[in-house]
Each structure stands twice: as C-alpha cells, then as structure tokens.
C-alpha cells in the first residue's frame, strides 16, 4: 500500500470519471511529445498509455517502483519513459505538451516554468482551484493571468471535488489548459534581443514576469506607487505615466486596471 507523502503534496486522483475527463480533454497533439509530471498511483498514466507514447517525471522512488510493477502486469499499446527526477529540472529538446495533476505546493512554479519554456506548446493541468482561477482570469486581474494570456489562451475546463482524491484535499481542484499561440509568442519575443527566437521568447517572458512582479507587488495600491518602490522601474515611472495618458487611463489606476501590459512594457523599454 502506498501512503501519500504530505511533504510532496500528494493527493491521488482515484475517480474514474474525472480521470477519463482529463484524458478526453487533451487537444490533438499532432507530432508533439506528451510529457507528464508526477506518476502518482499510475491511474492517469495508464489511461494515457492507451492512446499515446508518454514520458513521465516522478521524484518519488516508491511511486516509480509501483509504476514499473503495474506496467509489468498491465501491457499497454504505447511505451512509457519513466524519469526519476524532480520536474523542476524538466528539460526537453523537442516540442511537447504537458499534462499533470500538479502538487498544490509547487503548482504555480511548474506552470510558470512550462509557460516560459519555448519547447512546451501547451498544457493541461489540475491545480488547487484558486490557482487555476488566477491563471484563467480575464483581462489583467493578476500577474499570472497576464502571463498566461500574453503567451496563449488559458481556459478553465472543470472542477474536481475533494472526494475524487485519496487522501481528499481540503479544497476543490480545477483542470485548466493553456494553448500557446505563435503570434502572441512573436510579440513577446520582440521584448528581447537575442540571436535565436526561442532564446528571445524566454527572455521576453522573464522580462514581462519581472515587470509584473513590480506592478502587482501591492495589488490594492496604485500602479505608480508600486513602481516607485521598484529598484528596476522607479526611474521609468514617467514613461508609465505618459503611456497611461495616451491610453486615456488615469494615473491612479491599479495594476489590475491596465489594459495592455505588453504594450506598456514596450513603451517603458523604448529608448
């Protein structure tokens, strides 16, 4: 019997209907490699192997051993490459699509890593509902939604109740997807100077991420007050105010009220 480890944020999805809904929600992969973070008890992994070849990253050696045992007992039409490694160090050489029931405590960081990675073309993940809502929020409600919608389209798909897991978490989970869009990536890459597009895209994402941290540092305060406290951007506050004036937005706006962060950042970086 496998006991979930609190230190790794393990909650195993057991409900067959939700496992099927996740697999059925995958978009057409075409030639993309499918990458999974966290093998868990193997239930989602085995369902995926009925349809796709799969590479899975799992840090827990006990779960890796259980997965190997299940594969010996249950033959599948497609092969699994099981990598016993921390997914924070996930690095692929070919384009891929990410799928995962992410551990709550590290979900945001793993999603941001995937969004930042030019090789990742999209993701379908389950997180704590609160986190999913942040990534999928419209307009500029928070930094995570700006990042997700600047590089692609983020969509909340469905909720999963605590009763679907073992052990049950204290909160609801949600499944959402982010599908990257080449035109948005091109615009994001234009923020950076680099010899190769993928390098420019990654640098552009990191530049926007850093800017948003400053803008949303105190969400209830005005944008200008937040930037005044920023070592990196306080000297460029005049450019921000000029941009807001051109966009017919008051200088007292909060970060969540800015209409176009990519356009704003381009204006700030110019000259």
From Swiss-Prot:
Binding-site residues, S-adenosyl-L-methionine: 11, 13, 38, 58, 86, 101
Q: Which domain of life is it from?
A: Bacteria
Q: Which reaction does it catalyse?
A: adenosine(1518)/adenosine(1519) in 16S rRNA + 4 S-adenosyl-L-methionine = N(6)-dimethyladenosine(1518)/N(6)-dimethyladenosine(1519) in 16S rRNA + 4 S-adenosyl-L-homocysteine + 4 H(+)
Broad class of where this protein is predominantly found: cytoplasm
Q: Name one GO cellular component term.
A: cytosol
- EC nos: 2.1.1.182
Q: Where in the cell is it found?
A: Cytoplasm
- Where does the record locate the signal sequence feature? none
Q: Which UniProt keywords apply?
A: Cytoplasm, Methyltransferase, RNA-binding, rRNA processing, S-adenosyl-L-methionine, Transferase
UniProt lists the family membership as follows: Belongs to the class I-like SAM-binding methyltransferase superfamily. rRNA adenine N(6)-methyltransferase family. RsmA subfamily.
Protein known as: Ribosomal RNA small subunit methyltransferase A
Organism this protein belongs to:
Helicobacter pylori (strain J99 / ATCC 700824)
Taxonomy of origin reads:
Bacteria, Pseudomonadati, Campylobacterota, Epsilonproteobacteria, Campylobacterales
């Amino acid at each position: 019997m496998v006991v979930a480890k609190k230190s790794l944020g393990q909650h195993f999805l057991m409900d067959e209907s939700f496992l099927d809904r996740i697999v059925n929600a995958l978009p057409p992969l075409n030639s993309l490699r499918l990458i999974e973070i966290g093998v868990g008890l193997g239930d989602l992994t085995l369902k995926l192997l009925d349809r796709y070849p799969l590479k899975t990253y799992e840090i827990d050696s006990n779960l890796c051993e259980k997965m190997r045992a299940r594969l010996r007992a249950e033959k599948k039409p497609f092969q699994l490459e099981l990598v016993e490694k921390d997914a924070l160090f996930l690095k692929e050489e070919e384009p891929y699509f990410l799928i995962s029931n992410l551990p709550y405590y590290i979900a945001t960081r793993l999603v941001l890593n995937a969004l930042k990675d030019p090789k990742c073309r999209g993701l379908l993940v389950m997180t704590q509902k609160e986190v999913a809502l942040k990534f999928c929020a419209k307009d500029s409600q928070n930094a995570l939604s700006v990042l997700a919608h600047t590089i692609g389209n983020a969509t909340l798909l469905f909720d999963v109740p605590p009763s679907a897991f073992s052990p049950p978490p204290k909160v609801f989970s949600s499944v959402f997807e982010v599908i990257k869009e080449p035109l948005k990536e091109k615009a994001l890459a234009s923020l950076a100077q680099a010899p190769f597009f993928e390098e420019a895209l990654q640098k552009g994402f990191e530049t926007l991420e850093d800017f948003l941290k400053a803008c949303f540092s105190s969400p209830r305060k005005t944008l200008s007050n937040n930037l005044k406290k920023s070592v990196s951007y306080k000297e460029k506050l005049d450019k921000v105010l000029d941009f807001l004036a051109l966009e017919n937005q008051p200088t007292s706006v909060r970060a969540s009220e800015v209409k176009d962060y990519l356009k704003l950042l381009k204006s700030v970086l110019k000259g």
